[in-house]
Design a protein with these regions (language model features):
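Extended, well-ordered protein cores
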Residues: 2-468
Length: 468
């Protein structure tokens, strides 16, 4: 269904269309604020076009799965909020755009004092209109070790309001009437965008900023500004290793290594890299005219998505990644990054690298479809034939379900590499999903359950086509 069809279908327009408009507006704003991000988008588009030309079979798979039309749309952004009230209201804001909180991520064990969720659409149809999602992190003030600093940070955050009056009015209107009409949707996008805009003026003195940054640079990024500026946007590539190699050639300062699994024939989950965050001028509350402070937080990211893994597959992935990092003593450094890549590839060699094998071992999620041979045999297919038998007979085929979520270790690695300063070890704190959900105002959805439902729905539809 086209976006124009959605808009004319009813008085209140589709939340998916509002999300598509918001995503485009966000991209335009970020390219103006961070021109280097525009350069990154052009590089990714070039690499994708070259990849599709050289791999027509991959292009056919993407076209069949409806992934091709949305390939060059930004896939996600990220923000960090400071209070439970901000988190609860941001949930309501994203709900206007059909975005739901999916999964709980605790980044504290990886040395980042936040816990997070991803706001995204949850159906293939909605993703087809706009795949945009936002990784949203809530600062864990209880992890600030200095009591006086913790209380000061809480007081600073309590004074700010990150939403315009117009945004709050339109959120309430959408909730009251079950959506927004076309004109109000445009007003909403304009008003909501202000929450994510960059502000050069800090809300703290230079000394307060330094005290927050000394505790953790992310704490300063959350507390010291008027709102949760978007800290990165992310296009999708089909060949992240080529993008990583070409960034320095284009004058783009790339982070040290690609986060996530190694390069494979059958991509797993999510691989990410970025250009390093900009060192930007800011003004503290006690600065004189002509003086400028510095802040490092905003960057451009690239992602390459692979197949979603089952709980069994994810457990194996986590085990292998932990083993690779233990081999080099933690996250890769300039001194051992080549060794890390070699160890990662060697250790992951035990993870099957063919979709048929991953499916047979229950490691990944797949869509099912009836083949032309299967449709021709409809009505004569044995009622007790297993899915494996139907696949072996060529009556069913599988296609990998794209992983639409995130990886906490990778997210932490991206954050750490773009905040500057010395990376710290993990916080001695337990995950607290219950507290996060209380602050959010609802339970997060299970990403595993969503993939399972999607897979089973496709299987039932395919079996019906076989006359089962």
């Amino acid at each position: 269904m086209s976006v124009s069809t959605i808009a004319s279908a009813q008085h209140t327009i589709s939340p998916d269309l509002i999300r598509a408009r918001f995503s485009q507006a966000m991209s335009d704003m970020y390219q103006q604020e961070v021109p280097l991000y525009g350069d990154l988008i052009h590089l990714v588009a070039e690499v994708n076009a070259d990849f599709l030309e050289k791999h027509p079979e991959e292009a056919a798979v993407l076209a069949h799965s409806q992934e091709l039309p949305r390939l060059n749309l930004e896939r996600h952004g990220a923000i960090r909020v400071g209070t439970a009230e901000e988190l609860a209201t941001i949930r309501r804001l994203f709900a206007v755009m059909g975005m739901h909180p999916v999964a709980y991520y605790d980044l504290a064990p990886a040395g980042v004092p936040v816990h997070s969720t991803a706001f995204r659409a949850i159906t293939a149809e909605a993703m087809g209109v706009s795949p945009f999602r936002v990784f949203c992190s809530l600062l864990r003030l209880e992890l600030i070790e200095n009591t006086e600093l913790r209380e000061r940070a809480a007081a600073i955050l309590a004074k700010r309001c990150i939403f315009t009056d117009e945004a709050l009015r339109l959120i309430a209107l959408s909730e009251a009437q079950g959506g927004l009409d076309d004109a109000d949707a445009n007003r909403f996008v304009e008003a909501a965008l202000e929450t994510f805009r960059w502000h050069h003026e800090a809300t703290v003195s230079a000394a307060e900023y330094q005290a927050l940054a000394d505790q953790h640079r992310l704490i300063a990024d959350v507390v010291a500004f008027k709102g949760p500026h978007i800290n990165h946007l992310t296009p999708r590539t089909l060949d992240i290793d080529t993008v990583q190699r070409l960034m320095p050639e284009r004058g783009i300062d790339a982070k040290l290594s690609v986060e996530g699994p190694p390069q494979r024939q059958c991509a797993l989950l999510l691989r990410q890299t970025s250009f390093k965050a900009l060192n930007e001028d800011i003004r503290f509350t006690d600065q004189q005219a002509g003086e400028a402070g510095k802040h490092t937080a905003r960057f451009g990211e690239i992602e390459q998505r692979g197949v979603a893994l089952t709980a069994k597959g994810r457990a194996l992935y986590d085990q292998l990644l932990d083993e690779a990092r233990e081999k080099i003593g933690g996250a890769p450094t300039p001194a051992n990054v080549d060794t890390y890549y070699q160890e990662l590839a060697r250790i992951f060699s035990v993870f099957p690298d063919a979709h048929a094998d991953m499916h047979a071992q229950g490691l990944a999620f797949y869509h099912y479809r009836a083949t032309e041979q299967g449709k021709a045999a409809a009505g004569s297919v044995a009622a007790d034939a297993s899915v494996e038998a139907l696949l072996a007979q060529g009556l069913l085929a599988i296609e990998p379900i794209t992983y639409e979520d995130f990886l906490p270790v990778s997210a932490a690695g991206i954050f750490q590499s773009n905040l500057g300063g010395v990376e710290r070890g993990g916080y001695a704190s337990m995950s607290n999903q219950q507290l996060f959900e209380r602050d959010l105002g609802q339970a997060v959805l299970s990403e595993i359950a969503l993939y399972e439902q999607d897979s089973q729905a496709s299987l039932q539809a395919a079996l019906q086509q076989l006359g089962r």
